[in-house]
């Protein structure tokens, strides 16, 4: 397994442990974070990811899990395939969808993230 894959695996491990400081420490200072749903990092950097993505998800959902099942690496690019699940805090609806996450690693830190997910299923759980 490559160092890049191990780094991304460490990120998911930190999320599963609800250890946001450890997850954020794995990111480059100017990380670019791109999502397909309404949670957005409104700038570059770990603080923007925390404020625009991670904190809102944890506030809006319970039983949150990002569970990777496969990692594919090519140099500094890592793709993780897995499932996102959770229960929406207001509607009490459960979502369980597949995702593809594309990561770029530079200098031993996460430089970029792109998310691909079933946005309709997530949106339906929110209403």
PLM segments and residue spans:
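Hydrophobic pocket/interface hotspot
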Residues: 8-11, 23-24, 31, 49, ...
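A beta-strand edge to alpha-helix "cap/lid" segment located at domain peripheries
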Residues: 3, 54-127
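A solvent-exposed, acidic/Ser-Thr-rich amphipathic alpha-helical stretch
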Residues: 21-24, 28-76
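Short, low-complexity N-terminal intrinsically disordered segments enriched in polar/charged residues
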Residues: 1-29, 126-127
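Short, mixed-charge, low-aromatic patches
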Residues: 5-14, 36-40, 57-61, 81-83
């Amino acid at each position: 397994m490559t160092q890049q894959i191990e780094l991304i695996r460490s990120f998911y491990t930190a999320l599963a442990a609800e250890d946001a400081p450890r997850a954020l420490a794995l990111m480059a200072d100017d990380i670019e974070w791109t999502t397909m749903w309404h949670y957005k990092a409104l700038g570059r950097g770990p603080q923007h990811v925390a404020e625009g993505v991670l904190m809102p998800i944890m506030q809006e959902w319970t039983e949150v899990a990002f569970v990777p099942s496969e990692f594919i690496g090519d140099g500094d690019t890592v793709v993780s395939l897995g499932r996102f699940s959770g229960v929406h805090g207001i509607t009490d609806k459960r979502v369980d969808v597949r995702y593809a996450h594309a990561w770029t690693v530079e200098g031993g830190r996460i430089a970029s993230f792109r998310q691909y997910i079933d946005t309709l299923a997530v949106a339906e759980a929110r209403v």
